[in-house]
Amino acid sequence: MSDKPTIVFLGPSYPYRGGIASFTERLAREFQSSGFNCLLYTFSLQYPSFLFPGKTQYANEARPKDLNIKEAINTINPLNWLQVGRELKRLAPDFIIVRYWLPFMAPAFGTILRIVGQNKHTKVICIADNIIPHEKRMGDKMLTSYFNHAVDGYIAMSAQVQHDMATLGINKPIQLLHHPLFDHFGDPVERMMARKELGIDHQGGLLLFFGFIRQYKGLDLLLEAMADPRIKENGYKLVIAGEFYEDPVKYTHLIRSYQLEDQVILFNEFIPEHKIRYFFSAA
């Protein structure tokens, strides 16, 4: 192993897609540029296909050449957890940075980290996107407690997450650090050029709803707001850019019932990283 301090990241990264994977890869690059040796332990299986609500879990971009990524963790195979735990125990990195956003991950991560902790060297830091999930299920608290006992300290991504930790009685060091600005999606594009790239023929105000769509995201409330006569009179349009993780019929019905067909532009798809700048520049 290198003489540089070593960080292992546990959580989604390539070939998996999404905001957490993108964040983890960007963070690893930042640590590498600061002199750390970084290894990314991603999933060999993240979710069984029948549990995943989207079209695919996988990115369509090329594999990053500047990151050391290992597809190692199978979230539903306890024998795999033991194997990965023993491997990381022997590796003895200085730090493990683990992402936590869903109690489903607690058995795998909690078991792996317990085994790693036996080396009495590696410190485990959790970046907590959520501690209490948006969509609650029986057993969530028990699973999160199992995970928590294997963690040395937390970074909370919002004041709400920090509050949720107190609610659950988590008595570990917690640092509140808000989500940094992403700077790896390319430079901004002139507004009308961005709209042309997306095929949007509109000169007026443009609002953007970006990201996958589930009930707790509030798109139904935004569509209700778009029906306000003041919004219509000022010529605003709404771009919805993201994949539906639930039946879209509810939302298409709202669009029709509020007579928003001419105000809503829908991109029902996962937006790849190279296109993201166009959506934010167009709005």
Report each predicted region and the residues it spans.
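Active-site donor-binding acidic/aromatic loop of nucleotide-activated sugar
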Residues: 246-250, 261-272, 279
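A short helix/loop element that forms part of the nucleotide-sugar donor recognition site in Leloir-type
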Residues: 186-200, 253-255
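Conserved donor-binding/catalytic core segment of Leloir-type glycosyltransferases
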Residues: 200-217, 223-226, 239
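N-terminal strand-loop element at the rim of the active site
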Residues: 13-17, 29-90, 161, 166, ...
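Short alpha-helical donor nucleotide-sugar binding micro-motif in glycosyltransferases
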Residues: 148, 277-283
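Donor nucleotide-sugar binding/catalytic pocket of nucleotide-sugar-dependent glycosyltransferases
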Residues: 149-188
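A conserved, positively charged/aromatic
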Residues: 32, 117-118, 132-152
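Glycosyltransferase donor-sugar binding loop
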Residues: 43-47, 235-252, 269
